[in-house]
Every structure is written in C-alpha cells, then in structure tokens.
From Swiss-Prot:
Keyword Cell division among UniProt keywords: no
Organism field: Drosophila melanogaster (Fruit fly)
Single Gene Ontology BP annotation: larval chitin-based cuticle development
Record's function text: Catalyzes the transfer of a single N-acetylglucosamine from UDP-GlcNAc to a serine or threonine residue in extracellular proteins resulting in their modification with a beta-linked N-acetylglucosamine (O-GlcNAc). Specifically glycosylates the Thr residue located between the fifth and sixth conserved cysteines of folded EGF-like domains. Involved in epithelial cell adhesion/interaction with the extracellular matrix by mediating glycosylation of proteins in the secretory pathway, such as Dumpy (Dp).
Entry protein name: EGF domain-specific O-linked N-acetylglucosamine transferase
Renumbered ranges of motif Prevents secretion from ER: 517-520
Pfam families: Glyco_transf_61
PROSITE patterns reported for this sequence: ER_TARGET
Sugar-modified residues: 52, 176, 250, 479
Any one GO molecular function term: protein O-acetylglucosaminyltransferase activity
Length: 520
C-alpha cells in the first residue's frame, strides 16, 4: 500500500473531531512517520482506527528500533557506514550494530533492558521505583520529596549534590538497599547520575498518599531535570535531547508523548534561556524550579528522572562513536519532533542553493574579512546568501531560517548546534574548528548531514596567538581572516554535494513530501 495516501488519510483523520478523542484519549501531535510507529507501539489504540488507515506491510511493521520485535527493515532509519569497516569492528555488520547501540535506538533498547526495580510495591497504592544502571534514568510512583530544608539554604542551588538529605526522599515499598547502593558508581558529578539524590531514599511505614505528610500532591506526571548551561545552545540541547530520548525509555503508556506534563528544574535559580521555547515541545505547562516547591513536602504520583546531559558514555555529550558511521535515526527523530512541535515552517528549495552565514558578535572568533568572503557568493546566481546574527532573533525564528538552509556556515561555537535542524541533504561548514576538531564534526555525523571545515592552515590568518583568560595561547580566543579563493572553493564543493544528494529536490515543483516528511 503506498505510504503517501495512508499518511494523508491519517492527517485528515487526526484533524477530524471524532478522531481527536479515541475513548477519551487524544492522539499526540507527531510527524506522520512518528505517528505510525506510535500507533504500532500501542495496538489497542491502533485498533480504534479504521483498518484502511493503519495499513499493512511496511506500515504495520514500522517500528523505531528499540522494540524487541523490530526488524532492520522496519526501523526508523539504518545507520550509514560506507566503505570498509575500520577500527575495532570485526565486520561491516558489527560496525553498523556498534554505532546503532552507541548513538541510535539501540541505546534506548539498552536502557530498557537495564530497567530494574529498586523499590517494589505490595499493594496498588504503594510506591515504586525502578532505574537503569548507575541510576541514569529512573521513574517512580507515589514518592515524597521533602524540600523543607531548602528554605534555610542561603546560597542558590545549581549543580549541588546535597539538595536532599537522609530521609528526604520517601516511599512505601520494599526497598532493595543492596541493589540501590550498588548503582552509586557514577556520582562524581551532579549531571552524571541520580545517585546523589537517590542515596537518600528511605521507606515510610504507611502509603505516601495516606500518610498525612504531603503538603502538596502533584497529580500531573512530572519530569525532574538536572540541566546543563542554559545560555549555551550546545549544552542546553544536551538536556532537550536526553529528555526526548527519555520519552522512549518511559514509553509504557499511550500518554508517553502527552504535553500535559510538568517540568521541574533541579535548581533554585529562575529558569531563563534564549532556547526556553523548546520546552513547549514537551510540556504545555510553565516550567517549575525548586523555588516553586521549597518549604514543602511534595508527593508526586508519577515522576521521571530522565537521562542526564553529562552521563559517562552518554548521548550527545561524551558520546563515543565508532569511526566510519553516521546518520542516527534517534537524532533525526529528535530534529523532526522539535520542528513539528514548535510548528517551524518548511519551504522546499527553489532554483538556488540557500546559504546562511552566521555572523558572530562576540569578542573572539570573529571573521575579520567577512564582507570580502561573502561578496563572490552573493554575486553568484546559483546562490541565495543571507548573513544573520542569531543572538538577535527569537529562537523559533532562528529555527525557521535553519530549517530552510542548504549550507550553514559559521565559526566554531555553540550556534553550530543548529546543524541538528538542517534538512537531510544539507551541509554544515565549520569555517574554522579552532583546534577542536571533533565536537561539531561528530554532531553532524550523528544528525546525518555533511560536514566541512577549513583544511589549509596556511590560508587562515589569526589576528594573534590568542589569549586564554587563565593564561597562555589559545586558538578560541582570537579573530581570523581567510583566503577568499579557498573559501569559495569549499562552498562550491559543498554545493555540488548537496545537488547530488538523493533527497535534494531536483525541481522547484517537486513534492516536498519526498524529502521532508509530511507532518500532522
């Protein structure tokens, strides 16, 4: 059965009033390929849809990749590992499998296989707690967090490992203390594990909700997040990406992608970030911080402690990647999910390659001959060139530009994290990596877009040796000029790669559904 009519049918169905609520349940807002897999995950929900819309064959077998019965043919995406296998893989199959387990839905499958009960309920209203290895992801029911001690803290809390003390995290369940204490190896840093918090877990003699101890009962499912730097896009998207991955680890109920959830940030600083709109992809509620609950004993009916931004061998940050592979389906799914939920418009390419140049307004890593570099590109009829300073634009406006860019050019810096939201055929051109060669190269591999950077060291001209604030020369703390001819050569090469990409539209009139998935 052709996929496009099915997707269009689902589109119309999802917009129809009688399909918005299936037995009182609303279908989540997801891109079409995501929605198909969501429905296959919950067959009872799928059975409520007309059979001509749920499809057969490739549609009925479509899966994400972490499911036990998911076949390689049904996966959301298979990694690309061209050429001979290299490194420590013994075969091509082992190379693909290694990448899939390191950075794709295989990683989700591993987390699911590790979920182990730490505190087991006896009766229906009891508490529960289960976690993956090293307490990197946990979820619980009917748990009491005692935040009364925060009122006496003089300092603001961020990256603290002593937010909770002994007996300030309670549940009524059978606690396996030996098992829980055996998972405390990764507590050297606040952002590596939930161990600093869970080491204080203790047992109440009575059910939490009947104990009379709850000052506040939170009925809304809650994600408690320990987050990285909020003003740095690269680091804050470590948070958002791991939150998205955690939705799959927690996907035991059709409400897994529901936005009626509460986000609680594990610090007392007011939450502020230029990227704060991204939380709207996950929750329709205002973000809480510890300041919203301090002084209270808060009982959560359903609480998730999601994957953390700086886990050892984690996702996004500190991700080990086998050589020779790219195109993580999990990273592509994250990109499509955010663009869909934030309703970022898509415009198919026309006759020209769309080039976006990120102009820095910071003290360091400015391009001193910016005008000279861009002049020949602007004079070329093949290119549509725009120069932008993203720090001056709302984040959703930034995404609207990035999503409709074919070549994104910029100096080494957090703004290059926008490569996550480029079209599949696009190229990220890190003008100069400032002697940090792997950060955005690896991120481009994970997302599955082409990557280029400056190679001719004799054709880049630093203003000086660079002066690190703590002393010594440093390539990130100076400004640069570049050879114009070599710059144009690199851009032309990137354009040729884009034009030859199998997903790049060959004609302006070509249906964008062939390259960018239809969305609901």
């Amino acid at each position: 059965m052709p996929i496009l009519p099915i997707l269009i049918g689902i589109l119309h169905l999802s917009l129809a009033e009688d399909a918005k609520h299936l037995d009182g349940f609303s279908l989540p807002s997801l891109p079409s390929e995501h929605l198909i897999r969501y429905l296959n995950t919950f067959p009872k929900l799928k059975q409520q849809l007309p059979t001509n819309l749920t499809g057969k064959g490739t549609i009925s077998s479509a899966c994400w990749g972490h499911e036990r019965d998911c076949t390689p043919a049904g996966r959301f995406q298979t990694p690309q590992c061209p050429g001979e296998h290299t490194g420590w893989a013994r075969s091509k199959e082992a190379q693909v499998r290694t990448f899939y387990n390191q950075a794709d839905f295989g990683y989700i499958q591993e987390q699911l296989s590790q979920l182990t009960p730490q505190c087991v309920p006896t009766y229906l209203g009891d508490s529960s707690l289960e976690c993956t290895h090293y307490l990197r992801f946990c979820r619980g029911r009917n748990l009491l967090f005692d935040f009364r001690g925060l009122e006496q803290r003089e300092e603001r809390i961020r990256y603290h490992m002593d937010v909770l003390g002994p007996g300030q995290l309670l549940g009524h369940c059978k606690l396996n203390r030996t098992r829980l204490s055996g998972e405390m190896e990764h507590i050297g840093s606040a952002l590596q594990s939930w161990g600093p918090e869970l080491r204080n877990f203790d047992v109440l003699p009575h059910p939490v909700l009947e104990s009379g101890l709850c000052d506040v009962v939170v009925n809304t499912p809650t994600f408690i997040m320990k987050i990285d730097a909020t003003y740095n896009m690269y680091h804050h998207f470590c948070d958002f990406f791991n939150l998205y991955a955690s939705l799959f680890v927690n996907q035991s109920h059709p409400a897994a992608f529901n936005t009626d959830v509460q986000i609680l940030i594990w610090e007392t600083y007011p939450y502020d970030s230029p990227f704060r709109d991204t939380f709207k992809a996950f929750s329709q509620r205002p973000v809480w911080t510890l300041s919203d609950v301090e002084g209270k004993r808060v009982c959560f009916k359903n609480v998730v402690l999601p994957l953390l931004p700086r886990m050892i061998f984690g996702l996004f940050y500190n991700t080990p990647i086998i050589q020779g592979c790219s195109n993580s389906g999990l990273f592509r799914a994250f990109s499509e999910f955010i663009l869909h939920r934030l309703q970022i418009p898509y415009k198919p390419p026309q006759q020209k390659i769309r080039i976006t140049y990120l102009s820095r307004r910071t003290k360091y890593r400015q391009v001193l001959n910016e005008d000279e570099l861009l002049a020949p590109l602007e004079a070329n009829d093949k290119y549509d060139v725009q120069r932008v300073s993203y720090e001056r634009l709302p984040f959703t406006n930034q995404l609207a530009i990035t999503r409709n860019t074919d070549i994104l050019i910029g100096m080494h810096g957090a703004g290059l994290t926008h490569l996550l939201f480029l079209p599949n055929w696009a190229c990220i051109f890190e003008l100069y990596n400032c002697e940090d060669p792997n950060c955005y190269k690896d991120l481009a591999r994970l997302r599955g877009v082409r990557y280029r950077t400056w190679e001719q060291r004799d054709l880049v001209y630093p203003q000086d040796e660079g002066h690190h604030p703590e002393g010594g020369a440093h390539a990130k703390f100076t400004n640069y000029s570049f050879d114009v001819k070599e710059f144009v050569h690199l851009v032309d090469g990137a354009a040729e790669e884009i034009l030859s990409h199998k997903e790049f539209p060959r004609r302006a009139s070509e249906n964008p559904s062939k390259t960018q998935r239809n969305e609901l």
